[in-house]
């Protein structure tokens, strides 16, 4: 059947126009004309009004758009609801996670341990100014040191970038030493404690070591305990705490640093008055080889009121046993500092029968600044494992686990802490 709206079936244009005008005026549907030409067929729908096709299409489009928009809004509401639920689940957790560990800490434990640790770490960031005696004379630049009043001073250059590198290294070590308490001590040198500031501002330019150490300690994570040896040494800066001809501290300077460690860790401090002082005169240290006019030094060391034995393992793996932490045959000359634990060896273990030890064990990861320091720890630990990171060929974490060591002290002189090659050597202990 032909389309009832196809105007091609009308006889002529005039009739088509009339019928179109009729539809517009009376809004009635057009009668259909059959193809057999018998005349128009009456419409049997009793003049029921119909919407034009365009209006139908518009209605359908409007309805479809409303449906699409409604569905989109519902999907958006669903997404927002899901995200909100996830956010509330994360923020409403009962547990807090330490930023430097994968271990979850219950809120009650965090509340009791973190404030104490944070308070101790904050106290380590307070530095006093050493009151250095000054006769207002001027020195001169020697070889690798500034010479003033018969003593050599190694000038320091450091910045926040180097401080960040060192702190990052210590933080990394702590994370790898699972279940072990980690301490860090950075030791200032003679320039900081013996050379007047007026010279460091002029003929002997040297950066602030207090500022450098403070930057390091401030960047350590909360699981590392910084030991502020600086203030203890500063309080005694006009005593014989550094050698004149060498870059190391004296046995007395190391002792004051030890007292800072013992106090920071709430342990009994060894009383030097209960010990026996021994001296070797005529020490000419590392600076004396290249600079004239330096005052010759005296090396003092103290034997303890309890027994200490020493086992040294060399680079070949051979272990030797001694009945003292000091080399009994040490004598005057350029190598006298080596009397402390017999110098730099890969591994040295001190065994103590001090009543304060109570079976505790500690590892000291050090360079040569740790040699004069480590013997004092025998007052507080039954075993002191002294590891020279430059020569130790084992994995530190494995070694601590195998030997039941629960505490590790990283001890570095200020120059070492700001030297990349030293950091690389320490990195090798845990790689």
Predicted regions and their residues:
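Extracellular glycan-modifying ectodomains
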Residues: 2-431
């Amino acid at each position: 059947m032909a389309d009832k709206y196809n105007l091609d079936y009308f006889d002529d244009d005039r009739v088509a126009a009339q019928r179109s005008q009729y539809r517009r005026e009376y809004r009635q549907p057009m009668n259909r004309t059959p193809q057999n030409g018998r005349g128009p067929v009456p419409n049997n729908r009793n003049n029921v009004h119909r919407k034009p096709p365009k209006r139908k299409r518009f209605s359908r489009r409007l309805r479809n758009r409303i449906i699409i928009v409604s569905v989109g809004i519902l999907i958006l509401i669903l997404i927002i609801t899901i995200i909100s639920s996830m956010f509330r689940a994360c923020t409403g957790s009962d547990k807090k996670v330490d930023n430097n560990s994968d271990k979850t800490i219950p809120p009650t434990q965090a509340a009791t341990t973190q404030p104490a640790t944070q308070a101790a770490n904050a106290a380590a960031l307070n530095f006093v100014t050493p009151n250095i005696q000054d006769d207002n004379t001027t020195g001169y630049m020697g070889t690798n040191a500034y010479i003033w009043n018969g003593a050599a001073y190694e000038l320091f250059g450091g910045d926040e970038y180097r401080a960040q590198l060192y702190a990052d290294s210590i933080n990394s070590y702590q994370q790898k030493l699972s279940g072990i308490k980690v301490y860090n001590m950075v030791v200032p040198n003679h320039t900081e404690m013996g050379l007047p500031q007026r010279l460091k501002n002029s003929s002997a330019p040297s950066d602030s070591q207090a500022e450098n150490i403070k930057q390091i300690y401030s960047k350590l994570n909360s699981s590392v305990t910084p030991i502020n040896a600086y203030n203890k040494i500063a309080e005694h800066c006009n005593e014989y705490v550094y050698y004149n001809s060498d870059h190391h501290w004296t046995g007395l300077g190391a002792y004051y640093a030890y007292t800072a460690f013992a106090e920071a860790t709430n342990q009994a401090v060894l009383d030097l008055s209960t010990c026996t002082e021994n001296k070797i005169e005529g020490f000419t240290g590392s600076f004396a080889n290249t600079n004239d006019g330096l005052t010759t030094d005296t090396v003092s060391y103290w034997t303890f009121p309890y027994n200490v034995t020493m086992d040294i393992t060399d680079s070949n793996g051979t272990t030797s046993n001694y009945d003292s932490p000091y080399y009994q045959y040490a004598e005057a000359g350029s190598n006298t500092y080596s009397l402390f634990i017999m110098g730099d060896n890969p591994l040295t273990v001190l065994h103590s029968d001090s009543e304060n030890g109570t079976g505790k064990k500690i590892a000291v990861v050090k360079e040569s600044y740790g040699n004069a320091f480590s013997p004092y720890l025998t007052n507080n630990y039954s075993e002191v494992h002294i590891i020279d990171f430059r020569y130790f060929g084992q994995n530190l974490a494995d070694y601590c686990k195998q030997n039941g060591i629960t505490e590790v002290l990283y001890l570095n002189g200020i120059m070492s802490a700001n030297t990349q090659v030293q950091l690389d050597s320490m990195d090798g202990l845990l790689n």
